[in-house]
Amino acid sequence: MSGPVDLRALPSVDQMLNAAAVSPLVEQHGRAVVTDELRKVLGEVRLAVRSGGALPGKDGIVAALLSRLDDRSRSNLRPLFNLTGTVLHTNLGRALLAQEAVDAAVDAMREAAALEFDLDSGGRGERDSHLRELLCELTGAEDATVVNNNAAAVLIALNSVGAGRQAIVSRGELIEIGGAFRMPDIMERAGVDLVEVGTTNRTHAKDYVKAIGPETALILKVHTSNYRIEGFTAEVPGAELAAIAHERGVVLLNDLGSGSLVDLSRYGLGREPTVREAVAEGADLVTFSGDKLLGGPQAGFIVGRRDLIAEINRNPLKRALRVDKIRIAATAATLKLYRDPDRLASRLPTLFMLSRVQAEVRAQAERLAPQVGAMLAPSGYAVEVCSCSSQIGSGALPVDTIPSAGLRIVGSSGSALEALAALFRSLSRPILGRLRDGALVLDLRCLSDEAEFLKTLSEGSGDAVA
């Protein structure tokens, strides 16, 4: 029986820092960081030895140090495989950018750019000038501006047009968006007084007409993109609402939420109102998002009457809500893709993923199932190809689903599947699926890099236990 381990045999921090295997780590991570992590490793070794553990050699200490440094340098905001079946997943960053947008953003990051500089006159320029012409071309609006998201767009539009006055909204359109942000709360922050009309399921033209008075600044129409009321319902069409507003000298603000620049039905998806249609119907201002159906970076767009856009741009909030050169560059590159609608689905990742037919996704699942099954079988998991349903996400077309396909993984118990899902989340590139009906389902609609997926999966398959 061996006696107690002599901790004096444990190398000191200085000895380890001078070791040949540690010197490159100091060069890579910095002496202060390596020293800090090395002290933690040696502290853990002392505790383990005092509890009866063996004293590791220098190689073991270096391995533990490497592991800690890797964990420390790894970003939590790292790429992952979104196999949840929700294409525009709010918690996973929504839209993936087109390569043209990525390239434009990188160029803007690397060099100085004429963000607010007029190269013709040599004087101060406008930040919006890089997007105004594109937005007006694609929507038919007189003018346009951009802020950092659609909630900000609604906030500043309401504040600019209606602060201290009333805004009329149908009760059926008082929505709540993600994170418990409610339209009445946004209106309160904007400084407008909410006037509710109609009922939850039915609002008529006469309800708006009756509510308009001397203190009315605007009518707010909100596209209920994240839910749908069906059955005994009625709402006032945008064109009719515009006529009511204009006859009585008030502004019509139409918040489209997700917002689409093209008719999605041509790509086999459900019908969503387009921004151009809202402008043509007579809305004075239209707000919509950049990182949802449009497929660009996060942004909130406001298009409409030139005088109202000018008023918004004079609002002190505009500076607080403005976007930087990186997002402007990526947004401009994204918008330019819409000039060629025939090739849009092949160039815009969001639209490409949404428009993939089920047969194509199923063929991908059939290619991958044998390999994934072989990796997980030793741990007691079975893999089969399955049909499933994808959804758009981010509040767009909430009741519409898209026929899809994927891999259905079953184990010995529900706890085994939860353990497998946790293992997948811990991989160098996490794999996210969804647990349902006694299985872990990986919807492959959003999987583009099969080789990287298999490589990542192989890293953790040996640790899976059913």
Curated annotation (Swiss-Prot):
Domain of life from the UniProt record: Bacteria
Descriptive protein name: L-seryl-tRNA(Sec) selenium transferase
Alphabetical list of InterPro entries matching this protein: PyrdxlP-dep_Trfase, PyrdxlP-dep_Trfase_major, SelA-like, SelA_trans, SelA_trans_N_dom
EC number from the UniProt entry: 2.9.1.1
Involved pathway(s): Aminoacyl-tRNA biosynthesis; selenocysteinyl-tRNA(Sec) biosynthesis; selenocysteinyl-tRNA(Sec) from L-seryl-tRNA(Sec) (bacterial route): step 1/1
Cited function: Converts seryl-tRNA(Sec) to selenocysteinyl-tRNA(Sec) required for selenoprotein biosynthesis.
Modified residues (N6-(pyridoxal phosphate)lysine): 292
Signal sequence segment: none
Single GO term (MF): L-seryl-tRNA(Sec) selenium transferase activity
GO cellular component, one term: cytoplasm
Main location: cytoplasm
Keyword Protein biosynthesis in annotation: yes
PANTHER family for this protein: L-SERYL-TRNA(SEC) SELENIUM TRANSFERASE
Alphabetic keyword roster: Cytoplasm, Plasmid, Protein biosynthesis, Pyridoxal phosphate, Selenium, Transferase
Cofactor: pyridoxal 5'-phosphate
Protein's cellular compartments: Cytoplasm
Catalysed reactions, semicolon-separated: L-seryl-tRNA(Sec) + selenophosphate + H(+) = L-selenocysteinyl-tRNA(Sec) + phosphate
Underlying gene: selA
